[in-house]
Amino acid sequence: MSNIAFYVVSDVHGYIFPTDFTSRNQYQPMGLLLANHVIEQDRRQYDQSFKIDNGDFLQGSPFCNYLIAHSGSSQPLVDFYNRMAFDFGTLGNHEFNYGLPYLKDTLRRLNYPVLCANIYENDSTLTDNGVQYFQVGDQTVGVIGLTTQFIPHWEQPEHIQSLTFHSAFATLQQHLPEMKRYADIIVV
């Protein structure tokens, strides 16, 4: 049996550097680069590890606000995320704050799979995959990405008008029988 670690980064909200940008000389114990440094140091002790982005990365910092206002592209943010070598990610509710075209462009640029099994556009999931399997030695790890179905309660309707949000719980129940057949370890 392999020694496996799961590292989850969540709610980064575009804070790449260890600062909240309120002053020039401020250092905070936060940010994607600092989290990645800690993860990379720790993961050496495991046979296998997974680095996961749990969503809410696309909106929330002055950096993200600058990108949408001045370039209309998330490319600089995506460049950082791609260099972090995530194994997979999922969507948070704030990924929808700048509209669906901006989100889709971001998803196309990411170099890791973004899993979301319960948000649909027309008849297929918004992301390429909802469930993915990874082989780790003699074990199979099954991963399902789920996002809150309550996004329509607080997101601007024009940002999500072509999407259908299914219950995360019901979606998990639907996928679990198959995942249990194929996976030794299930990650939600």
Residue spans of the language-model regions?
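Acidic, metal/ion-coordinating pockets
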Residues: 1-188
